[in-house]
Amino acid sequence: MATKFNASVPQLSRSQLIDVLCSEYATKRSVIIEGPTGTGKTQIGRDVAARLGFPLVYFDCNVKGIEDLTCPQFVTINGVEVVRSVPHEEFGLQFDQPIVLMFDEVAKNRSLIPGITRVLLERTIGSVPLHPKTVIFGTTNLGAENFGDVVPGFVMSRVALIGMKNPTVDEMLQYGAATGWDAALLAAIHEMPGLIDCFTNVEKPEDNPYIYDPRDSSRRSFSCPRSLHNLSDLLHERQYLGDDVVMNMAMGIVGAAAAKHIMNLVTLGDTLPKFKEIVADPKGVKAPDSAGARIISALMCLQRVEAENFSPIFTYIKRLPMEVQALFANQLMKTPTKAVWVSRQADFTEFARKNFALFTQ
C-alpha cells in the first residue's frame, strides 16, 4: 500500500543488503541503511563480518563522541613539536587487515556526523587510511519514526542511502525456527502478519494496533522482530513463571493488543501432542482440528525434526491439511541445516515429486 510515508523510497531486503556489503562496491563506497526500529539492522554487521571473515568494529553513535574517533598525539617534525590525530586502538588499524566498520545509529548524534562523514567518504580515520578492503556502513532509523534520525543532505550525496524492507513472514519463520523461537509465537506471526508490518504501510494507526506508529503516542510497547524475540525468550520460561506473570510481561514487551492474541495461541499450544508422542505414534496420536493448532504443531515439528526421526514426523504431518503440509515442507527446504539431509529422504522426495507446485509458489 502506498502511503505518504513510503512513496519513492528505494528499499532492499536484508539479504540483498548483505550481498551489497559483501561486494567489491562496499570496499570503494560507503552505505547507510535506513530501516524501521527493531528489524535487525545491527545484526547485519555481524552477518557481513562472518561472511567476509573480517573483524567487526561496532561504533555506537548514541554513546560516542568525536573524540572516540581519534586522539591527539604530540610529535616532532623538522624540529617542530606539533599535534596529529591518531585512530583509537579499537579500529584495529595496527593489525593492517580489513575490517567491517559499522556506525550504528549514524544519524542520531548530530555533533558526530561531520567527523563520521570524512570516514565514510575518504575512508580514513585522522590521517591514517583504512585497509583498502575495509567495508564501511552505517545504520539509522526512519526519519518518520520521530526518533531524531535525520541524515543531512551533505551526507546523502557522499554515500549510498538505501532503505531496508521489513522482514517477510517467510523470513521470520525461517529465522525463528533456526534460532529456537517458541512455536506458538511463530504460528502467531504466520496467522497475523501485521505483527511484523511497518507503520509506513498503514493508512491509519488504528488499522494495525500491534506495531509502533509515531501517530499514536500511547504505544509505549509494540510488536517488532526485536520485541518478538524478547517475548520468545520469556515464553520459554512460562512453565516456571506462570501465565499471570508471563501475560503481564508480554504486554510490557509487545503491547497489550499483540500480547492478547499471541497468548491465546500459546494457550492453544498446550492442548497439542508432544513431540515425543508424535514420534512414538505418528498414526495414532490425536491430530489438532483447528487451523491455528495445526500450524503450531507443524512449526514445532519443523524446529525439532532431525534425520533420525524424520520418517514418523512426516507421517504425522501428512495427516494434516495440504496447506499445512506445504508450510512444513517449504520451510524445511529453506532451512540450510535440514535441507542437506531431507533431500535424501525417500518419502520426502516422493512427496515433492507429486506436489511440485507447492515448491514453486
Predicted regions and their residues:
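C-terminal regulatory/interaction module of P-loop NTP-utilizing enzymes
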Residues: A2-Q361
